[in-house]
Protein backbone atom coordinates (compact mmCIF):
# COMPACT_ATOMS: atom_id res chain seq x y z
CA UNK A 1 0.00 0.00 0.00
CA UNK A 2 1.36 3.37 -1.00
CA UNK A 3 -0.49 6.43 0.24
CA UNK A 4 0.46 9.74 -1.32
CA UNK A 5 0.17 13.22 0.15
CA UNK A 6 -3.06 14.99 -0.83
CA UNK A 7 -2.53 18.62 -1.83
CA UNK A 8 -4.71 21.19 -0.12
CA UNK A 9 -6.53 24.24 -1.44
CA UNK A 10 -3.99 27.02 -1.93
CA UNK A 11 -1.47 24.79 -3.71
CA UNK A 12 -1.13 26.19 -7.24
CA UNK A 13 -1.03 22.71 -8.80
CA UNK A 14 -4.73 22.30 -7.97
CA UNK A 15 -5.51 25.30 -10.20
CA UNK A 16 -3.72 24.00 -13.30
CA UNK A 17 -5.23 22.15 -16.26
CA UNK A 18 -4.22 18.50 -16.61
CA UNK A 19 -2.99 16.90 -19.81
CA UNK A 20 -4.54 13.78 -21.39
CA UNK A 21 -3.16 10.31 -20.79
CA UNK A 22 -1.81 8.64 -23.94
CA UNK A 23 -2.56 5.02 -24.79
CA UNK A 24 1.19 4.34 -24.75
CA UNK A 25 1.28 5.20 -21.04
CA UNK A 26 -1.29 2.58 -20.08
CA UNK A 27 1.11 -0.36 -20.08
CA UNK A 28 3.94 1.30 -18.18
CA UNK A 29 4.85 0.23 -14.65
CA UNK A 30 4.71 3.86 -13.55
CA UNK A 31 1.12 4.27 -14.73
CA UNK A 32 -0.06 1.04 -13.11
CA UNK A 33 1.62 2.01 -9.84
CA UNK A 34 0.05 5.47 -9.99
CA UNK A 35 -3.43 3.94 -10.32
CA UNK A 36 -2.80 1.59 -7.36
CA UNK A 37 -1.45 4.50 -5.30
CA UNK A 38 -4.48 6.64 -6.15
CA UNK A 39 -6.89 3.94 -4.97
CA UNK A 40 -4.80 3.38 -1.82
CA UNK A 41 -4.75 7.12 -1.12
CA UNK A 42 -8.49 7.52 -1.74
CA UNK A 43 -9.37 4.59 0.54
CA UNK A 44 -6.97 5.70 3.27
CA UNK A 45 -8.56 9.17 3.26
CA UNK A 46 -12.05 7.60 3.17
CA UNK A 47 -12.92 9.48 0.01
CA UNK A 48 -15.34 8.63 -2.77
CA UNK A 49 -12.99 9.82 -5.50
CA UNK A 50 -9.54 11.22 -6.15
CA UNK A 51 -8.12 13.09 -9.14
CA UNK A 52 -4.44 12.95 -10.08
CA UNK A 53 -3.89 16.70 -9.55
CA UNK A 54 -4.82 16.19 -5.89
CA UNK A 55 -1.59 14.23 -5.50
CA UNK A 56 0.45 16.57 -7.67
CA UNK A 57 0.13 14.74 -11.01
CA UNK A 58 -1.22 16.93 -13.84
CA UNK A 59 -2.73 14.08 -15.84
CA UNK A 60 -6.39 13.48 -16.69
CA UNK A 61 -6.84 10.59 -14.27
CA UNK A 62 -9.65 10.06 -11.78
CA UNK A 63 -10.40 7.08 -9.56
CA UNK A 64 -13.77 6.63 -7.86
CA UNK A 65 -15.32 4.03 -5.62
CA UNK A 66 -17.21 3.69 -2.38
CA UNK A 67 -18.96 1.01 -0.37
CA UNK A 68 -21.32 1.24 2.58
CA UNK A 69 -19.65 3.73 4.86
CA UNK A 70 -20.64 5.32 8.17
CA UNK A 71 -19.37 8.61 6.79
CA UNK A 72 -21.92 8.46 3.93
CA UNK A 73 -24.90 6.52 5.31
CA UNK A 74 -27.47 8.05 2.95
CA UNK A 75 -25.56 7.90 -0.33
CA UNK A 76 -25.51 5.04 -2.82
CA UNK A 77 -22.33 3.09 -3.47
CA UNK A 78 -20.17 4.19 -6.38
CA UNK A 79 -18.52 1.30 -8.26
CA UNK A 80 -14.72 1.37 -8.44
CA UNK A 81 -13.63 2.82 -11.73
CA UNK A 82 -10.63 4.43 -13.40
CA UNK A 83 -11.58 7.40 -15.58
CA UNK A 84 -9.09 8.78 -18.11
CA UNK A 85 -9.49 11.80 -20.38
CA UNK A 86 -13.16 12.37 -19.53
CA UNK A 87 -15.50 14.54 -21.55
CA UNK A 88 -18.67 15.55 -19.70
CA UNK A 89 -21.72 16.99 -21.43
CA UNK A 90 -24.76 18.08 -19.37
CA UNK A 91 -27.97 16.52 -20.73
CA UNK A 92 -30.40 18.69 -18.80
CA UNK A 93 -30.69 22.10 -17.23
CA UNK A 94 -32.17 20.45 -14.14
CA UNK A 95 -29.77 20.40 -11.22
CA UNK A 96 -29.32 18.46 -8.00
CA UNK A 97 -27.78 20.02 -4.94
CA UNK A 98 -25.44 18.25 -2.53
CA UNK A 99 -23.31 19.27 0.40
CA UNK A 100 -19.92 18.55 -1.11
CA UNK A 101 -16.60 18.18 0.59
CA UNK A 102 -13.16 17.55 -0.83
CA UNK A 103 -10.02 15.79 0.31
CA UNK A 104 -8.17 18.93 -0.82
CA UNK A 105 -10.42 21.17 1.29
CA UNK A 106 -10.38 19.15 4.53
CA UNK A 107 -12.87 19.76 7.29
CA UNK A 108 -15.18 21.94 5.19
CA UNK A 109 -18.20 21.51 2.97
CA UNK A 110 -20.46 23.60 0.79
CA UNK A 111 -23.75 23.32 -1.05
CA UNK A 112 -23.22 22.92 -4.79
CA UNK A 113 -25.78 22.42 -7.55
CA UNK A 114 -24.77 20.49 -10.65
CA UNK A 115 -26.56 19.08 -13.70
CA UNK A 116 -28.28 15.92 -12.53
CA UNK A 117 -27.93 14.07 -15.83
CA UNK A 118 -24.75 13.99 -17.89
CA UNK A 119 -23.15 12.17 -20.77
CA UNK A 120 -19.61 11.10 -19.99
CA UNK A 121 -17.10 9.73 -22.48
CA UNK A 122 -13.82 8.33 -21.18
CA UNK A 123 -11.18 5.65 -21.44
CA UNK A 124 -10.31 3.19 -18.68
CA UNK A 125 -6.91 1.89 -17.61
CA UNK A 126 -7.08 -0.91 -20.22
CA UNK A 127 -7.73 1.50 -23.07
CA UNK A 128 -11.40 0.55 -23.40
CA UNK A 129 -13.63 3.48 -24.33
CA UNK A 130 -16.97 4.25 -22.72
CA UNK A 131 -19.90 6.54 -23.48
CA UNK A 132 -22.49 6.52 -20.73
CA UNK A 133 -25.47 8.52 -19.49
CA UNK A 134 -25.12 9.08 -15.74
CA UNK A 135 -27.51 10.67 -13.29
CA UNK A 136 -28.07 11.35 -9.61
CA UNK A 137 -25.36 11.04 -7.00
CA UNK A 138 -22.94 9.26 -9.35
CA UNK A 139 -23.18 12.20 -11.78
CA UNK A 140 -22.32 14.57 -8.93
CA UNK A 141 -19.29 12.49 -7.92
CA UNK A 142 -17.98 12.30 -11.49
CA UNK A 143 -18.44 16.02 -12.13
CA UNK A 144 -16.78 16.93 -8.82
CA UNK A 145 -13.72 14.75 -9.50
CA UNK A 146 -13.42 15.68 -13.18
CA UNK A 147 -13.51 19.38 -12.25
CA UNK A 148 -10.10 18.85 -10.64
CA UNK A 149 -8.70 18.07 -14.10
CA UNK A 150 -9.58 21.62 -15.18
CA UNK A 151 -8.19 23.27 -12.05
CA UNK A 152 -11.65 23.74 -10.52
CA UNK A 153 -12.52 23.08 -6.87
CA UNK A 154 -16.08 22.73 -5.61
CA UNK A 155 -15.70 26.03 -3.75
CA UNK A 156 -15.56 27.72 -7.17
CA UNK A 157 -19.09 26.46 -7.84
CA UNK A 158 -20.68 27.78 -4.65
CA UNK A 159 -23.58 30.12 -5.41
CA UNK A 160 -24.01 31.20 -1.80
CA UNK A 161 -21.04 31.42 0.55
CA UNK A 162 -23.46 31.27 3.48
CA UNK A 163 -23.82 27.60 2.53
CA UNK A 164 -20.11 26.90 3.09
CA UNK A 165 -18.37 26.17 6.34
CA UNK A 166 -16.60 23.78 8.67
CA UNK A 167 -18.04 20.28 9.10
CA UNK A 168 -18.12 20.59 12.88
CA UNK A 169 -19.97 23.92 12.72
CA UNK A 170 -22.57 23.30 10.00
CA UNK A 171 -25.78 21.49 10.86
CA UNK A 172 -25.23 17.74 10.97
CA UNK A 173 -26.99 15.23 8.76
CA UNK A 174 -26.22 16.86 5.43
CA UNK A 175 -24.99 14.82 2.51
CA UNK A 176 -21.28 15.25 1.97
CA UNK A 177 -19.11 14.26 -0.98
CA UNK A 178 -15.34 14.09 -0.61
From Swiss-Prot:
Transmembrane segments: none annotated. The keyword Iron applies. It comes from the Bacteria. It is an enzyme of class 3 (hydrolase). Binds 1 Fe(2+) ion. InterPro entries: Peptide_deformylase, Peptide_deformylase_sf. This is Peptide deformylase.
